[in-house]
């Protein structure tokens, strides 16, 4: 993988953890993007000195522009969904890590692949909604698709020798069960959004935490696994409250 990274969705949970890795290993950060978290983005710009920054929210773009006005060596700013796509396609972008939340990530994923960039993918919706588009584009352009989601990354690492990849039959995706695991129907009555946001193992963004509590996230991960590893959607799921178990392949 290139040691030059362009990080889409840099201010979210996965984005900030990815920058921890860049900091630890000295990776060059070519570009960053965010939706509206200007203060976090300003701190990241000050530390990592990206050449380009894309901001999709119009008001946040204006706020960031004003904050950077007159600064020497300020990054070039790109605006809106078009700016996000442009950032993903740039020469010199290196490996594009897509940690954008939601369907907005699909266009950026395809843009990066079609521009010849390896794609480290944390955006579930790219494969859930456009799996055939993404996998076809990867094959056509001869790039690497690297899963970032912990379960899929665990499987990917298990399959790095040719024998394992050729003989894969089943994938087991683990599920913590979220904050409501083991509760009876009666115990679930009256639970609130605030309760659902109390994940027992991880501090994540609100959307993925709610998806975890309802097990919707695990359904998305099953679809992802089917596209990533070429298996029918009958992968087995099992519940493991321990965060140490991520995935198992057979």
PLM region spans:
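Mid-domain beta-loop-alpha active-site segment that forms a flexible
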Residues: 149-154, 200-229
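Rossmann-like NAD(P)H-binding beta-loop-alpha module
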Residues: 106, 111-115, 131-196
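Oxidoreductase and adenylate-handling cofactor-binding alpha/beta cores
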Residues: 156-169, 218-234
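N-terminal glycine-/serine-/threonine-rich beta1-alpha1-beta2 phosphate-ribose binding loop
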Residues: 1-103
């Amino acid at each position: 993988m290139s040691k030059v990274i362009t990080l889409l969705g840099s201010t979210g949970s996965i984005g900030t953890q990815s920058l921890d890795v860049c900091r630890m290993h000295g990776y060059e950060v070519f570009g960053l993007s965010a939706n509206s978290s200007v203060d976090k983005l300003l701190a990241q710009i000050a530390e990592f000195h990206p050449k380009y920054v894309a901001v999709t929210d119009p008001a946040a773009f204006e706020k960031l522009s004003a904050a950077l006005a007159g600064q020497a060596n300020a990054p070039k700013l790109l605006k809106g969904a078009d700016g996000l796509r442009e950032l993903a396609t740039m020469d010199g972008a290196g490996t594009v890590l897509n940690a954008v939340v939601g369907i907005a990530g699909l266009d950026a994923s395809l843009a990066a692949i079609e521009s010849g960039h390896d794609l480290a993918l944390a955006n579930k919706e790219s494969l859930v909604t456009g799996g055939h588009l993404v996998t076809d584009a990867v094959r056509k352009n001869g790039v690497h698709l690297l899963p970032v989601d912990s379960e899929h990354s665990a499987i990917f690492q298990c399959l790095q020798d040719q024998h394992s990849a050729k003989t894969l039959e089943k994938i087991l995706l683990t599920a913590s069960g979220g904050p409501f695991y083991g509760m009876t129907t009666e115990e679930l009555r009256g639970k609130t959004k605030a309760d659902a946001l109390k994940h027992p193992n991880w501090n994540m963004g609100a959307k993925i935490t709610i998806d975890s509590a309802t097990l919707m996230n695990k359904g998305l991960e099953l679809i992802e696994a089917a596209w990533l590893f070429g298996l029918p959607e009958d992968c087995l799921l099992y519940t493991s409250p321990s965060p140490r178990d991520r995935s198992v392949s057979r």
